[in-house]
């Protein structure tokens, strides 16, 4: 079974969103779906708004749609989008 390295971009609803709390919620969703978060970063967007970027590894057969949907359903999230997906080698 192949594994995928996935990058997801999470846009908070506003600049008032606690990004640390949001990051923990997103990591819990990814872990619950069988993923392992490796890298986390913040990307400035505009006017103080920052996007949360998480890179994680997941089994290829699971897919990313359930993760994207669950993250998008969070109250403090405007959108969640997979921005990169690659097969892991080795």
Task: Say what each PLM segment does.
Residues 1-90:
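Long, contiguous binding/interaction regions
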């Amino acid at each position: 079974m192949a594994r995928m390295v996935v990058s997801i971009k999470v846009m908070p609803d506003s600049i008032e969103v606690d990004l640390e709390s949001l990051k923990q919620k997103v990591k819990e969703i990814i872990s619950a779906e069988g993923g392992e978060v490796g890298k986390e970063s913040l990307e400035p967007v505009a006017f103080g708004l920052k996007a949360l970027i998480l890179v994680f590894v997941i089994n290829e057969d699971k897919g990313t749609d359930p993760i994207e949907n669950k993250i998008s359903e969070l109250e403090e999230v405007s959108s969640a989008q997979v921005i990169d997906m690659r097969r892991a080698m080795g």
